[in-house]
Amino acid sequence: MLQTLKTLTLIPARMASTRLPNKPLADICGKPMIVHVADRAAAAKLGRTVVATDSEEIFAIVTAHGHEAIMTREDHESGSDRIYEALMKVDPAGEFDAVVNVQGDLPTIDPDIIRRALLPLEDGPADIATLGVEIEEESEKTNPSVVKIVGSPLAGNSRLRALYFTRATAPYGEGPLYHHIGLYAYRRSALERFVKLGPSPLEKREKLEQLRALEAGMRIDVELVRTVPLGVDTQADLDRARILVAQGI
């Protein structure tokens, strides 16, 4: 990938998980989960990588492992607000063109998937870029926890222009359904605009923050990849992550 945008990768990390207490610091083969994520984000080689956290303990551990971290406020209502605060602290002069937001609970994510999230900003007109995977499991099609992308195919069917995101089974009729992966790349100007918008009606109804951008007329393009990275939300997920890391994945 010929990278033309000066890019900052930010990883939000909080201790607020109720299902898995102290999740960012959960040990995975001798290393805290948040450090695994930072390692993989850095391996994507998109530029500077920073963990944004409201926890002094996370800050200390991340920096002890050789990564950069920054403290943010505790009272943010959304991850994008935390990302924007971190951006303004790290880069008040506006040197970075784009921001990649990698969730802090993806300890086995392939660095190539992180790189691919930036592609719709590199070679297209999108304001925001994200990722999707074609759904193969029938149970996922009706699972409201699996967010679906309703979009128009672009670029030889390797990309979609997002028209809507929903927890419902959509679109209706014959054809593929797509699982949204919550990893985002923002043009700096788009992130600045996004955080200044209030929560939108459809965002509040579906409980999907990205709908705020679509309702405001912003363009979101979706790069299609082959696999959904493992997100760690439960003890079973953590056990699975430990197995994968032990296997060298």
Swiss-Prot record:
GO cellular component terms listed in the entry, alphabetical order: cytosol
Pathway the protein acts in: Nucleotide-sugar biosynthesis; CMP-3-deoxy-D-manno-octulosonate biosynthesis; CMP-3-deoxy-D-manno-octulosonate from 3-deoxy-D-manno-octulosonate and CTP: step 1/1; Bacterial outer membrane biogenesis; lipopolysaccharide biosynthesis
GO biological process terms held by the UniProt record: CMP-keto-3-deoxy-D-manno-octulosonic acid biosynthetic process; lipopolysaccharide biosynthetic process
Pfam families the record matches: CTP_transf_3
HAMAP family tied to this protein: KdsB
Task of the protein: Activates KDO (a required 8-carbon sugar) for incorporation into bacterial lipopolysaccharide in Gram-negative bacteria.
Protein name: 3-deoxy-manno-octulosonate cytidylyltransferase
Organism (species): Brucella anthropi (strain ATCC 49188 / DSM 6882 / CCUG 24695 / JCM 21032 / LMG 3331 / NBRC 15819 / NCTC 12168 / Alc 37) (Ochrobactrum anthropi)
